[in-house]
Amino acid sequence: MDDIRQTIRTRPREGTARATSAFTELAQQVRHQGLLRRRYGYYWTKLIAAPLVVAVCLATFVWIGESWWQLFTAAALAIVFTQIAFLGHDAAHRQIFVSGRWNDWISLVLGDLLVGMSYGWWQHKHTRHHANPNKLGSDPDIELPVIAVTAETAARHRGPVLTWMRGHQGVFFFPILLLEGLSLHASGVRRVFARGRLERRWIEIAFLSIRLGGFLTLVFLVLSPGIAFVFLAVQLGLFGFYMGIAFAPNHKGMPVVPRDMALDFLRRQVMMSRNVRGTRLLDVVMGGLNYQIEHHLFPSMPRPHLRRAAPMIAEYCRTHDVPYTSVGLLTSYAIVVRYINRVGLGERDVFTCPLIEQRSLIGS
């Protein structure tokens, strides 16, 4: 199993009560270092820049007019929208302001109005993921419609063609991400029109209508239908691909938690998450998601503090014998592909054994 992922695998020494107090101790250290303090200058700079950059891109789009050079504009917009989505992710986790109301409105403007993703849909889905990452029956992120990332999902449908595709699904994983952008928009639209409680429903409907309807109208006013469709394919494809490759290394290929297994908060968040090592440029490119362990332990920690927190939290986990996983970017993708292929081939409980061992030791 060690050839699949680089994990510091050790054993917990303490019981459940001690494990709970261990996180409290870590939280006190993090707070003492000032790593939960808001970074208003950092975030206000980004909040002001976001609409300005979008405006510049759209002005450039209109200025270029009918031309295949617009495909470069499409690529630029894909990058800009993804970076704004990362900023909306920060706001939704209360990283920007102390006020929950301010964070909510920033999330609505960034997510619904600028990117075209429903904040209500994201909040409903992402909150469940954070509560129980990689847990069967609880984490919606491991219930994908096309790719099977758990043995339970892979076993539901069988047949010669599907069996072959599942056995090679790691190869198809990245091309499928090209459809993720369209899926994110569609999921948001379905959510705002679905039954059930949704705060600020009409605001979301209005913002999504302006963003999606306005953007489509502008594209077809400036471009001929042929170029317009290719432009949208490039913009949506690259947007979805960028979003997908930023989120994929975080948990895929990490242990899948059985439905009946209970873990303390520290192990539940650390053992199911993977950090991606890299430079500050990688921090920008991945929107801070490369510090997934720190983010899961302290969701409201401002993005600029994650890099500072990582060495301290890694050392704390080593001291308390909690497996802390950190790999390079290319290694993380290789792990994801190999793991998805193994699941597709029908291997069961690929990473369950270490979890069962941990649970038995925690309870001892």
Over which residues does each language-model region extend?
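Membrane-embedded catalytic scaffold of the fatty acid hydroxylase/desaturase
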Residues: L35, A76-R197, P258-D349
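Long, continuous compositionally biased terminal/linker segments
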Residues: A55, A59, S67, G344-L355
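Low-complexity, highly charged intrinsically disordered N-terminal segments
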Residues: P12-A49, V54
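Short, charged cytosolic
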Residues: D2-Q29, F172-S183
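Intrinsic disorder at enzyme termini
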Residues: Q358-S364
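Alpha-helical bilayer-embedded segments of polytopic membrane proteins, i.e.
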Residues: R38-I84, G111-G116, G167-L184, R197-A246
